[in-house]
Amino acid sequence: MEYEKVCNEILSCNNEIRYVAIYDYGELYEKMKPGINNYLTKEETEVSLSQAIYRWSTRKKTVSKIGNPIFAMAKYEKVYRITIPIGGAGLILVTTELSANVNEITEKILKIRSKYSTN
């Protein structure tokens, strides 16, 4: 998969997106909006993503009852954080400004993901 291309396309789809990362097979691919400082170090981001992947695995336990999970979103004091599965075990992580229309951004990310992945 062309992770760098996916990150670039997601980052450019909305000006309120701060950061995009794809974590897949133990590798982290990331892109940050120019002029923005990341709140987390790369190591902290990797730990956070590995924890998010675990949470996604627990969500899949209820698939037979409520269907496949599509995305997860959390609001923090400084950012929104959106996670979306990609590939077999990968995860897209996007952070946005609090002023962002996160539902609109999430729909755009899902469309971009569908161009590069079957899920």
Residue ranges and their predicted role:
Residues 1-119:
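Non-catalytic interaction/Regulatory regions outside core domains
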